[in-house]
């Protein structure tokens, strides 16, 4: 069985790890980095992922996607999506099913389809390291992701050619990474996870009993639309406002200028974690009739902190709720772990430290801990990691809509998963022949205040007065936190059941079509690589042949020279095209035409060697010295 890899699919950066022996190892990508920017660019000719996509973002802002995780599993009309529509340089559109999609080069794409490009790069990184195909993965998601966001993440995995063996919550993965080597007894750990686009807090009990380590999530809370991107946006707004005050020009309608501003704001924010002042300097940011305009703004750490103070404060309320849900006080928490790049900000660290009244752990890498935890969980699933039990929870309550538009909960939030629950309901009207089961997720009493996960009908109920039929509704949450619902008429035994997907979401057919599309592109990529190799070999052959013609000089007969030059011309023409077979054929023909050159070079080398060697040695030459001569000639060519 192949390795199961662990992937942290992040808003800003992604990371892949694998169990190497008994330790989880973070893998370096093709660029030599341990994390990969979660940026995807469509150039019209190819798809770029990671650092190559980031490098060209300024010149291709409308077709370069970042923070796509903020859209995954969301509806276009959601408030969070509408906020992003106004500030993103790329186009966010409403799909036919109501989902939030994106558009590049007039092609509409679902967020799982775009995210799959990042997962494919993670998959390739692991395959390059392991030297074998990878088909299975554990992928992390924010703990506060709802059912449709989790399902969309699994869809992204399928499109990338991965069977997602488990969806695991990011704070839980970080706790696994932190606690796997620590064998002490009962320990309450708070994992504060502030990433690029999401925020989670999980209270986790790590216990060691009879050699088995148990990681039990006691409570989780968070905000799936709060993260480093929001911090960046505050600084971007400030810089744009300052420029408008000074120059009287609005940069917000210029995607190119806004992309440059975004890069500069992110860089300034990072710098201000280690220095108290920085300067944002963007020459030629725009121009008007009077000439080019430059943006030069000094930003202090204090200014940045004042811009984002309310965002930091917003993270503290979920901490209070999570502690209350776990029935714990601040003093019960033994360790505080910070995860996510945004936790490097001194203001964030100070506020969290003050809230818990203790020093924060410094031995956890905020960028890599989640991927390491995912790899550990992959090891648990494959049987490579023994004596570890992970007990996660569902982050939000689940229930159905009942009479009066009320949400009746069947499974409360922070219930350990996998879990099952059932409840018996009845009809609201006399002789009602069918009931609609409307499945909801959230904490509000009024059904409209919660997330609709989907609905289905149970038909064929025998006529009876209202309140008489007995309809059992059963909820079953699997280890990925994904919900399966069934409804059964107890009298007739008629049943209806579904695996809940979002009321929109991608259908199986759409996912399969995207998988086929991804596979087709993989074939295209492989063919393109073969074509480039053939071109490089042909170019190399032409270059070497020209050099040998020059060296041969008058020794090469005019007839042979003409034949070789004709063959070279054919290669140069073939290289301009895209026919790999034609390039290889013309290269082979050039090799055959150049045989006279090889003879001349060999004779010349033998003559030179004969002059250098003593006469007796020259007479005693052995037949296999031809091989030495050829090697000698190659070295000589290199030196020239």
UniProtKB/Swiss-Prot annotation:
The gene is dnaK. GO terms for molecular function: ATP binding; ATP-dependent protein folding chaperone; unfolded protein binding. This is Chaperone protein DnaK. Induction: By stress conditions e.g. heat shock. Keywords: ATP-binding, Chaperone, Nucleotide-binding, Phosphoprotein, Stress response. CDD domains: ASKHA_NBD_HSP70_DnaK-like (cd10234). PANTHER family: HEAT SHOCK PROTEIN 70KDA. Belongs to the heat shock protein 70 family.
């Amino acid at each position: 069985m192949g390795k199961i890899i662990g992937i942290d699919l992040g808003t800003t950066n992604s990371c892949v790890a694998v169990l190497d022996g008994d330790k989880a190892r973070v893998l370096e990508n093709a660029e030599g980095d341990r994390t990969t920017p979660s940026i995807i660019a469509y150039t019209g000719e190819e798809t770029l992922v990671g650092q190559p996509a980031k490098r060209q973002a300024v010149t291709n802002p409308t077709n370069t996607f970042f923070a796509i995780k903020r859209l995954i599993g969301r509806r276009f009309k959601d408030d969070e999506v509408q906020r992003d529509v106004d500030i993103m340089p790329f186009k966010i559109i409403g799909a036919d099913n109501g989902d939030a999609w994106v558009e590049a080069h007039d092609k509409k794409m679902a967020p799982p389809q775009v995210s799959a490009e990042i997962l494919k790069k993670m998959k390739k990184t692991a395959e390059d390291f392991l030297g074998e195909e990878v088909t299975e993965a554990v992928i992390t998601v924010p703990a506060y992701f709802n059912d449709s966001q989790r399902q969309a993440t699994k869809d992204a995995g399928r499109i990338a050619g991965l069977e997602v063996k488990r969806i695991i919550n990011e704070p839980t993965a970080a706790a696994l990474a932190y606690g796997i080597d620590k064998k002490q007894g009962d320990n309450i750990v708070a994992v504060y996870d502030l990433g690029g686009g999401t925020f989670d807090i999980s209270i986790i009990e790590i216990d060691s009993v009879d050699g088995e380590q148990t990681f039990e999530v006691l409570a989780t809370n968070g905000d799936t639309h709060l993260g480093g991107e929001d911090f960046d946006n505050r600084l971007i707004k400030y810089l744009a406002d300052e420029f408008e005050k000074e120059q009287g020009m609005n940069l917000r309608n210029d995607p190119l200028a806004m992309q440059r501003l975004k890069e500069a704001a992110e860089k300034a924010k990072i710098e201000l974690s280690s220095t108290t002042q920085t300067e944002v300097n963007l020459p030629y940011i725009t121009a008007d009739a009077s000439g080019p305009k430059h943006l030069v703004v000094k930003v202090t750490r204090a200014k940045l902190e004042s811009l984002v103070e309310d965002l930091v404060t917003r993270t503290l309320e979920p901490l209070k709720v999570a502690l209350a849900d776990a029935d714990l006080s601040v003093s019960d928490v033994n360790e505080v772990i910070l995860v996510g790049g945004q936790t490097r900000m001194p203001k964030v660290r100070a506020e969290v430290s003050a809230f818990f009244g203790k020093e924060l752990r410094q031995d956890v890498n905020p960028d890599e801990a989640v991927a390491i935890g995912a790899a550990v969980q992959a090891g648990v699933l494959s049987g490579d990691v023994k004596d570890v039990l992970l007990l996660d929870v569902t982050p939000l309550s689940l229930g159905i809509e009942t009479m009066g538009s009320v949400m009746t909960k069947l499974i409360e939030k922070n219930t350990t998963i996998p879990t099952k629950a059932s409840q018996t309901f009845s009809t609201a009207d006399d002789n009602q022949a069918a009931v609609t089961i409307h499945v909801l997720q959230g904490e509000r009493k009024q059904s409209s205040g919660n997330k609709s996960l989907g609905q289905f009908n149970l038909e064929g109920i025998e006529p009876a007065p209202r309140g008489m039929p007995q309809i059992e509704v059963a909820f079953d949450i699997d280890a990925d936190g994904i919900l399966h619902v069934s409804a059964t008429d107890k009298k007739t035994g008629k049943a209806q059941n579904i695996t809940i997907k979002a009321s929109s979401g991608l259908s199986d057919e759409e996912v399969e079509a995207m998988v086929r599309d991804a596979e087709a592109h993989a074939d295209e990529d492989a063919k393109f690589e073969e074509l480039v190799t053939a071109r490089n070999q042909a170019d190399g052959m032409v270059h070497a042949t020209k050099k040998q013609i020059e060296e041969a000089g008058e020794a090469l007969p005019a007839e042979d020279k003409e034949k070789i030059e004709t063959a070279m011309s054919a290669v140069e023409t073939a290289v301009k095209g895209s026919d790999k077979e034609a390039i290889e054929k013309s290269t082979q023909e050039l090799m055959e035409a150049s045989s006279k050159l090889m003879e001349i070079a060999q004779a010349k080398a033998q003559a030179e060697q004969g002059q250098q060697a003593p006469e007796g040695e020259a007479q005693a030459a052995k037949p296999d010295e031809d091989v030495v001569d050829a090697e000698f000639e190659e070295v000589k060519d290199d030196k020239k």
